[in-house]
């Protein structure tokens, strides 16, 4: 045991005496990274500062309809009455989603799973779709 510990100490001292040089860092500034990713033209557009006046021109002048899409049908009907309501397709989709999210475990009784009827390999119907 003493022989192995005596050979271990000089080995540790040898490793501590050897100078270790780190690799040169590969960090580049943000301008070089943008130029490499997007090219010179797009990187100059991205790096230019934005005026608050430009942002104000893009924002609507008057407030729009409320943006909360609750699951209540009254909230969805209120959007169709407004002059700037969403498209009928989107509202129908949201109403359908609110109907399907209300289903609980009781609606899956009778062999119905998440995606309708499930038939096993042997032909028996199961409701283990979810």
From Swiss-Prot:
Q: Where is this region: Disordered?
A: 57-77
Compartments where found: Secreted
Origin organism lineage: Eukaryota, Metazoa, Chordata, Craniata, Vertebrata
**Which residues belong to the signal peptide in this entry?**
1-22
Task: Give the UniProt family note.
Answer: Belongs to the natriuretic peptide family.
In terms of Pfam families, this protein maps to: ANP
Q: Which GO terms describe its cellular component?
A: extracellular region
Q: What is this protein called?
A: C-type natriuretic peptide 2
Name a biological process GO annotation. receptor guanylyl cyclase signaling pathway
Record's function text: Exhibits natriuretic and vasodepressant activity. Has cGMP-stimulating activity. May help to regulate body fluid homeostasis in a variety of aquatic environments.
Q: Which residues form the propeptide?
A: 23-103
The UniProt entry, under InterPro entries, shows: C_natriurtcpep, Natr_peptide, Natr_peptide_CS
